[in-house]
Amino acid sequence: MCGLNVFVSSRPAAGPPDPATRAAFAAALETMHHRGPDDTRVEFGDGVAFGFKRLAIIDREHAAQPMHYHDRWTVVFNGEIYNYRRLRLELIREHGATFATEGDSEVLAAAFHYWGVGALPRLRGMFAFVAYDTWTGTVHAARDPFGIKPLYLLETVDGLFLASERKALAPFSGPDRGALDTDALAHYLSFQFVPEPMTLHRQVRRLPPGHRLTWTPGGGLRLERYFRPSLRPLHVRPEEAHAVIRDALRDSVRHHLNAEVPVGAFLSGGVDSSAIVALASEVKPDLHVFSAGFAHDGYSEIEVAQDTANQLGVRLTPTVVTEDDVIRELPRIVQLLDDPIADPSLIPLYFLAQTASRYVTVALSGEGSDELFGGYAIYREPASLAGIGRLPAGLKRGLRGLAHTLPEGMRGRSFLQRGTTAIEERYYGNARIFSPDEKADLMRFTAEPHTAVTAHLYAETADVDDVASMQYVDLHTWLPGDILVKSDRLSMAHSLELRVPFLDQAVYAAAAGLPTELKLPARGRATKHALREAMRGIVPESVRERRKLGFPTPTRIWLKGAIGDWVAGLMAGSGARSLLDLEYAQRLLADHRAGRADHSRKVWTVAMFCLWYAIFVDGTIRPAGSWSPSRPRAIIEA
């Protein structure tokens, strides 16, 4: 896993970049030093620049990047191709391809040389890459099907810029002040993250998951989707489905263990991480696993994880996070994310990755399981609302009007509201923060509604049940916009490569055809039923039957203590009041601290934006540990 940046000029005949541009490009690369501390290289040519920070995992001695192939292609690649050995043999057999290294980056370059965009469906892994055709001046780039690896892009009159993190584009995009995308901010207040392909900088966008781009000087940018996840239920026998899931996940885990560096895993004690650890320990009995928790009763997974580790026979190293740790590191965490994410679970993830990086260079984790196998409790909502949904339309309208007259927090109010609201209006992801009415009170600007993000997703799933539609929405919003962003940034912050076996194409295929009744049986409260059954006999029974835990985070408690004081001060002095009514947010905080209501998620969402604003716009907060690009590190320049 690595960091890349690329510049291709709209005027290639102008020659190599001038000294000022070269210095700015090298300095921008240094903002991503954490992504690849093992090797730094930059190359400049006529109208092009390539920068690469390498975290060496495969063929550590020889597979440096940028990678050149057949005097035609220059490739920079962030990620891992797990089936590269098989692809290498196919390229040799079909085309007589030759190789100078034993790594996957050269295989990727050769695959693109011989197969072109037809290589993309053959790739099994996580990737974001840029391939420059020196013969035609064309830029090709692509991102893996689910968006595990990031790729940001900026197109200006000067040319095309691409990078693994948005901060590496800052010298070329200009400051966030005056360029803030208020539609993106409005969506952040709804979703708790900025949905792809948007960023808070209106000029910078992300290449969407499962997409490729081509760009030529004078020809502009063209995007094309090469992968679209589909959740179309099939008629399958439960026993067969469970066997397919088990075999696919076992094979995926074995491929994800391939590395020339120490490999460990995250363990929460839930079925997802326990399944990965159990299957990994079949191959690697000495597997080292890691868990995190907080110094608050009821907010730690460590005891559960330790019990699971003992049953699986693996070594666990725990991490306990304190409030002082949070106050000290939160500015750095927000800076690493590039755009704010108000998901409190990113805090334990940061410290978990920090601890793991002291022992291993690669860690396996359970992201993606909930979206594929139906792991969120909210997916049970359509069944619970089915009765009210069958009422006549006129009666439902009357009940909806009644619900709005009931006091906030009154028992039954939310049930009536949600039961009389169409799913495409009521469900827009796993973390609905501010409602449209609340956003109208908070925002000092007008913006497009949240349905601008989700409407086309519901249109694409009009022929499936509500649960499949909800999963589809999460696969396109919550997973790439929240889960995978925090996983990538907060692991790479510590030069740790995080791998996610559940997002392997074969595991996805095993999950895609599951009917809802195999994921969420009508009886009981279990989620991910098919996965739990597939893991029977592999993970301990106590784990297999345990309900989903997530990363429990005590934000509700924090906001009533020292962290609440810190948040109050942050809001009081924030320049973000030009965009948000912070007096409104401060009233929410006051009500929360007085115990009149639980506004922790809303307050946290506003606070994280205020912190982001102080770092990226006002510059009033400079996180500890920030890299100053004023003096680049030693660089190998070609």
Locate the predicted segments by residue.
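Active-site adenylate/phosphate-handling loop in enzymes that bind or generate adenylated species
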Residues: P145, V157, F351-G409, T461, ...
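Alpha-helical subdomain
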Residues: Q335, H404-E408, A422-R426
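Adenosyl-5′-phosphate
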Residues: M1-L4, P19, A27, G174-R177, ...
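Active-site proximal helix-loop segment of RNase H-like, two-metal nucleases, encompassing DDE(D)
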Residues: L336-P340, A568
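Short clusters of hydrophobic/aromatic residues that line enzyme substrate/ligand-binding pockets
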Residues: V42, A64-M67, F99, L123, ...
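Short, basic, helix/turn surface patches
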Residues: V130, I341-A353, P392-G398, G573, ...
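Cysteine-centered catalytic environments shared across enzyme families
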Residues: M1-L337, L349, A353, R536, ...
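Short low-complexity, flexible loop/linker segments enriched in glycine and/or proline
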Residues: P331-Q335, Y379-E381, W558-K560
